[in-house]
C-alpha cells in the first residue's frame, strides 16, 4: 500500500509539488510544498526533496501523480519511470471533477488537489508506461503529418478565395507562392507516409497488426496508424472494443434519473475528435466499397435508423471487427461470415 503521495502540477518551465503522508484514509503529518524547474536538474532536485520529506517511508511506498499535459508532463514521467518510481498520469478532467468546491486557483493549490486525488483514488491507479520507441516515433510523425494536412487545407482555401477576387499583381504573387508552398507540403506529406511505412515495417508486432487492420476495406494507412498509436498497439484498453469505442467517442450512452429524465442513448462529446473524424471517413468508405458493411448499413436504414445513427453503428462495427481480428491474430479480413465469432459483433 502506498503511504506517500506526491502531487505534481506541470507547466512548461516549472513543477509544483505537494507531499501528503497518509495511512489508509487518515492523513498523517503536515503537507510539504516545493517548486522545481521542469528539466533534468529539476527532476533530481524533486527526488532529493521527496527523500528528505519521506518520513521513513521507502520508495515502493511512494506514488507520484500528475495531469496528462502532453509535452510538459512526458519528460518527468519518463525520467521517474526510468528510475523505477511509480507515477500515475491521470486525465485532468477526472481530477478537476473529483476535487469538490474550490475557491483558490494557483499552482500550489493544484498540486495539493492532485496529491489528494492520488491518495483518495489509489485503488484506481494506472501506472505510467511510456510507448515503445517504434510507437513513439510513429506518434510524432503521425501528428506532424496531420498538422501538415491542416496547413495544406488552409493554404488551398486561401488560394481559392483570392483567385475569385479581382486580379492584381498582389493576387498573382499570392497564388504563385501558395502553389509553391502547397507543392512543398505535398512533398513532405509523402515523405511522412514513407517514414510511417518504414517504422511499421521495422517492427514485427506493429507490422502484423497493421496488416490485419488494413485488410479491411475502408481502413487504410492513416486509420491503422492512428489506432496503433492511440491504443498502444491495443494494449492500453486490454483488447476491449467497448473501451476503444468510448475513447473514439462512438459508444452511445443514455441518461435516466427518476421519472423526469429519460434520454435515449447517444454518443458523448468526451472523445478524441481527431481519431473520431478519421474513423468517420473509414466508415463512409466502408459502407460504399465493403460489401458486408454496405449490407449491414442498408439493413439498419431499412429498419428506420437515421443515416447518422446507422453510420455510427458502422463505426462501432469496424472497431469490433478490428479488435476481434487482432486478438485472434487472423491473417486477414476476407468475409465477415467466414468468422463465426465476428458474425454477431
Where are the predicted features?
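Phosphate-backbone recognition surface of nucleic-acid-processing proteins
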Residues: 215, 221, 227-303, 307
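Gly/Thr-rich phosphate-binding beta-strand-loop-beta motif of the actin/hexokinase/Hsp70
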Residues: 2-21
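Acidic, metal-coordinating catalytic cores used for nucleic-acid/nucleotide bond scission
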Residues: 65-75
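Long, charge-rich intrinsically disordered scaffolds of nucleic-acid metabolism proteins
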Residues: 92-211
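Short, solvent-exposed helix-loop connector elements
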Residues: 126-140, 170, 263-266, 295-312
Amino acid at each position: 500500500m502506498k503511504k506517500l503521495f506526491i502531487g505534481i502540477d506541470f507547466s512548461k518551465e516549472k513543477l509544483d509539488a505537494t507531499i501528503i503522508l497518509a495511512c489508509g484514509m487518515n492523513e498523517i503529518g503536515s503537507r510539504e510544498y516545493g517548486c522545481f524547474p521542469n528539466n533534468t536538474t529539476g527532476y533530481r532536485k524533486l527526488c532529493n526533496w521527496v527523500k528528505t520529506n519521506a518520513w521513513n517511508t521507502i520508495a515502493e511506498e511512494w506514488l507520484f501523480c500528475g495531469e496528462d499535459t502532453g509535452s510538459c508532463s512526458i519528460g518527468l514521467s519518463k525520467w521517474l519511470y526510468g528510475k523505477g518510481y511509480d507515477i500515475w498520469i491521470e486525465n485532468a478532467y477526472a481530477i478537476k471533477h473529483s476535487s469538490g468546491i474550490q475557491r483558490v486557483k494557483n499552482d500550489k493549490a493544484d498540486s495539493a488537489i492532485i496529491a489528494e486525488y492520488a491518495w483518495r483514488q489509489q485503488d484506481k491507479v494506472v501506472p505510467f508506461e511510456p510507448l515503445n520507441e517504434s510507437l513513439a516515433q510513429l506518434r510524432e510523425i503521425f501528428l506532424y503529418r496531420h498538422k501538415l494536412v491542416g496547413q495544406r487545407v488552409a493554404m488551398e482555401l486561401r488560394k481559392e478565395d483570392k483567385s475569385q477576387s479581382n486580379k492584381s499583381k498582389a493576387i498573382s504573387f499570392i497564388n504563385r507562392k501558395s502553389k509553391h508552398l502547397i507543392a512543398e507540403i505535398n512533398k513532405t506529406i509523402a515523405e511522412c507516409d514513407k517514414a510511417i511505412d518504414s517504422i511499421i515495417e521495422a517492427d514485427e508486432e506493429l507490422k502484423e497488426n497493421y496488416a490485419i487492420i488494413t485488410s479491411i476495406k475502408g481502413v487504410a494507412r492513416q486509420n491503422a496508424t492512428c489506432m496503433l498509436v492511440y491504443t498502444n498497439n491495443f494494449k492500453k484498453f486490454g483488447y476491449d472494443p467497448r473501451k476503444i469505442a468510448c475513447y473514439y467517442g462512438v459508444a452511445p450512452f443514455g441518461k435516466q434519473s427518476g421519472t423526469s429524465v429519460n434520454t435515449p442513448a447517444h454518443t458523448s462529446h468526451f472523445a478524441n475528435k481527431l481519431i473520431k473524424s478519421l474513423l468517420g471517413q473509414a466508415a463512409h468508405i466502408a459502407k460504399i466499397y465493403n460489401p458486408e458493411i454496405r449490407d449491414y448499413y442498408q439493413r439498419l436504414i431499412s429498419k428506420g435508423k437515421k443515416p447518422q445513427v446507422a453510420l455510427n453503428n458502422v463505426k462501432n462495427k469496424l472497431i469490433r471487427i478490428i479488435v476481434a481480428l487482432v486478438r485472434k491474430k487472423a491473417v486477414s479480413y476476407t468475409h465477415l461470415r467466414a468468422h463465426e465469432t465476428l458474425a454477431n459483433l
